[in-house]
Amino acid sequence: MTTSDLVAGELAGDGLRDTRPGDTWLADRSWNRPGWTVAELEAAKAGRTISVVLPALDEEDTIGSVIDSISPLVDGLVDELIVLDSGSTDDTEIRAVAAGARVVSREQALPEVPIRPGKGEALWRSLAASRGDIVVFVDSDLINPHPMFVPWLVGPLLTGDGVHLVKSFYRRPLNVGDAGGGAGATGGGRVTELVARPLLAALRPELGCILQPLGGEYAATRELLTSVPFAPGYGVEIGLLVDTFDRLGLDAIAQVNLGVREHRNRPLAELGAMSRQVIATLLSRCGIPDSGVGLTQFVADGPEGQSYTQHTWPVSLADRPPMQAIRPR
């Protein structure tokens, strides 16, 4: 059982004791069983607009079902649904359009700025392509996402005061089929549990109450998103979390239980590269110099391991500036 599972269990009914940093916040800003209805949230919009952004890169197998889970909300709770495509070479765009989403490429979103690779770049550019007062990000590799993911995420922003960022938390199954096993009920979120949460405990312990600091499903005010830099690649979520805390404090952050999140689990080699970027971003946010050296991995060339091939994954320390400096609203 992971740390996140244990904390979720406490929220579900084991009780809270004011003995740990963040316990008061967990009682006030964490929704374990969100009860809002779509109709209630539509009424609470009070003239505010909501954009949902799906960053995508070669997600033809899942993009359609993710869009299908959100599209019934369009022209009601949701004002626009955008797929920000990062250069897919498969049928992601075709299937997204067929499902009813508007697809915007990185080039179209911000044509005057040369492209950089990575997820952080896609999310940053989506701010130029969208118009909502609230922006919801949902990963495109989700499997059978619950149709209430988006309503639950915007709930604290529409019904509360002072909240600017809403993170999600959930149980994360681990599909180990590639290793000859099956699907485990827990065990997903390996970078979160082995890298992000231990580092936050050391460097920003106040954020230890955030169950899924790297989760790709979250909502935020445009005011916040356009005022902070965006970290490159997979550092974008941890960068945004720390920036929000450092600028606005813990009470500007909330979290909502989305139940279960299933997605395409990645091999360890890719998780190593992801971890390297998360570490670089968190160190930089905490004022600790990073070497800027990429992660070198050694892969056995055969079952006997008699020789190894080196592969180095690059790491980036270059943030994108706040969008309001590029596109003042």
Swiss-Prot record:
Keyword Magnesium: yes
Keywords per UniProt: Glycosyltransferase, Magnesium, Manganese, Metal-binding, Transferase
Record-linked InterPro entries: Glyco_trans_2-like, Glycosyltransferase_2, Nucleotide-diphossugar_trans
Cofactor(s), by name: Mg(2+); Mn(2+)
Catalysed transformations (reactions): an NDP-alpha-D-glucose + (2R)-3-phosphoglycerate = (2R)-2-O-(alpha-D-glucopyranosyl)-3-phospho-glycerate + a ribonucleoside 5'-diphosphate + H(+); (2R)-3-phosphoglycerate + UDP-alpha-D-glucose = (2R)-2-O-(alpha-D-glucopyranosyl)-3-phospho-glycerate + UDP + H(+); GDP-D-glucose + (2R)-3-phosphoglycerate = (2R)-2-O-(alpha-D-glucopyranosyl)-3-phospho-glycerate + GDP + H(+)
Top-level class of the enzyme under EC nomenclature: transferase
Positions contributing to UDP-alpha-D-glucose binding: P55, A56, L57, D58, E59, S86, K119, D139, S140, D141, Y234, G235, V236, E237
Binding sites annotated in the UniProt record for (2R)-3-phosphoglycerate: G189, R190, V191, T192, N265
Pfam families the record matches: Glycos_transf_2
One GO molecular-function entry: metal ion binding
Enzyme Commission code: 2.4.1.266
List of residues binding Mn(2+): D141, H263
Family: Belongs to the glycosyltransferase 2 family.
Subunit structure: Homodimer.
Known role: Involved in the biosynthesis of 6-O-methylglucose lipopolysaccarides (MGLPs). Catalyzes the transfer of the glucose moiety from UDP-alpha-D-glucose (UDP-Glc) to the position 2 of 3-phospho-D-glycerate (3-PGA) to form glucosyl-3-phosphoglycerate (GPG). To a lesser extent can also use GDP-Glc but not UDP-Gal or UDP-GlcNAc as the sugar donor.
Name assigned to this protein: Glucosyl-3-phosphoglycerate synthase
Protein's organism: Mycolicibacterium paratuberculosis (strain ATCC BAA-968 / K-10) (Mycobacterium paratuberculosis)
